[in-house]
Amino acid sequence: MALSFLSPSLSRLGLWASVVILMVTVLKLLSLLFRRQKLARALDSFPGPPKHWLFGHALEIQKTGGLDKVVTWTEQFPYAHPLWLGQFIVFLNIYEPDYAKAVYSRGDPKAAYVYDFFLQWIGKGLLVLEGPKWFQHRKLLTPGFHYDVLKPYVAIFAESTRVMLDKWEKKASENKSFDIFCDVGHMALDTLMKCTFGKGDSGLSHSDNSYYLAVSDLTLLMQQRIDSFQYHNDFIYWLTPHGRRFLRACQIAHDHTDHVIRQRKAALQDEKEQKKLQERRHLDFLDILLGARDESGIKLSDADLRAEVDTFMFEGHDTTTSGISWFLYCMALYPMHQQRCREEVREILGDRDSFQWDDLAQMTYLTMCMKECFRLYPPVPQVYRQLSKPVTFVDGRSLPAGSLISLHIYALHRNSAVWPDPEVFDPLRFSPENMTGRHPFAFMPFSAGPRNCIGQQFAMNEMKVVTALCLLRFEFSPDPSKIPIKVPQLILRSKNGIHLYLKPLGPGSGK
């Protein structure tokens, strides 16, 4: 009897709930349509390639890999063009120096649409912070990249590299090409562990190391999420196997970072441990962070510490891996330049068997080759901003505040209007006389402006030491049957690895 009395009320309640859900859905749809109309109006003055009625340019980019397709679009649409990801997300894709300067000289925040996916792992570190807190963190972290701090790292770079090269000696003896990318990634993470946490032995000599696997997994999963529209909603993503895998990897990475920070803080409370730290040859990145204070004496919170350490591990590991791997690929493709770099390094070392800080500045030809490699294969092929205020470009066209910008560094570096014969590998583009008068935003491997890469000197030093030691130990040549397939996955990777043949150069060649 009671149930029959309640059933009309429940029916009415269900009806009202359905009406409310329908109204919310309609309002949401109207909001999206209004937003799309507003975005389309803002981009009226920017013609672009034809797009799919539902997916925008996403299918074309997924089908072609996007990188070289955008390069062809630079010829059809000078300066920039709209890039639609579906019907409701659009970036102005720019690849011209004056357009890049108009945005990247200002310090606009990173585009939340892209970088919010990073928050679960790296938190609010320097990469995603904005406003006064970004400025405070940038100021606190800058001393960590002073040359006095960087000097002792040269020996650490060399130590980790030699472990990798010994492994390559065994692989080279099989007279088969092999993929260098994973080994370089292992070495780069090993180096970062030592420079960040001060570990004499990071424990990364085993392929099943949980932290290494977690960091590798996280970068791959983040790119997959950015590329898959169905994963953009948090609620949906965390219910998927990929989402759960991401959370597990995050937990492993966070547990490791928290453990190391707790250990170091405890050591700073112990007099004996304090003395050991003072007697160490160098400060590591964590030392710098723990000692950082602003003008008011305020230090970084535990959450800030973890965010900056995780950010440094993320940005410093994969980008360096990409830069070194593609550089060695370029050296394999161009044996004349490879030999000239090798001879330069031998001349600098003379009778010595180890590098010193002052040697790095003398690697002029190797540096030119490295920059030319970065031009053709930038470690980070795209970066994103969201305009905090309107911008007017050099040709008079403008965009309102809130607009999303994609700086396509890969297309900028291969833009024939900026770089003559852009597909030709020519290190002399970066000779002092040829660099004179070049637009400061024509070459942006480390971004540019106030939000440029704070660790670029650290990265350049590491890549010089690593590649110089590689060239002293081996002669590199390509495998024509396994040409790398470029793919952007936050960094520039190869879909099928970077397979090279290595020929040992014998005793006295840098071992």
UniProtKB/Swiss-Prot annotation:
Reactions performed catalytically: an organic molecule + reduced [NADPH--hemoprotein reductase] + O2 = an alcohol + oxidized [NADPH--hemoprotein reductase] + H2O + H(+)
Binding site for heme: E315, C453
One Pfam family recorded for the sequence: p450
Protein name in the entry: Cytochrome P450 4B1
PROSITE patterns: CYTOCHROME_P450
Topology in membrane: Peripheral membrane protein
Main location: endoplasmic reticulum
Top-level EC class: oxidoreductase
Family according to the record: Belongs to the cytochrome P450 family.
Top-level taxonomic group: Eukaryota
Classification via Gene3D superfamilies: Cytochrome P450
GO biological-process terms attached to the record: biphenyl metabolic process
Disulfide bridges in this chain: none
Subcellular localization: Endoplasmic reticulum membrane; Microsome membrane
InterPro entries: Cyt_P450, Cyt_P450_CS, Cyt_P450_E_grp-I, Cyt_P450_sf, Cytochrome_P450_Monoox
Reported tissue expression: Present abundantly in renal microsomes of male mice but not in those of female mice. Also present in pulmonary microsomes of male and female mice. Not found in liver.
Assigned keywords, A-Z: Endoplasmic reticulum, Heme, Iron, Membrane, Metal-binding, Microsome, Monooxygenase, Oxidoreductase
Induction line: P450 can be induced to high levels in liver and other tissues by various foreign compounds, including drugs, pesticides, and carcinogens.
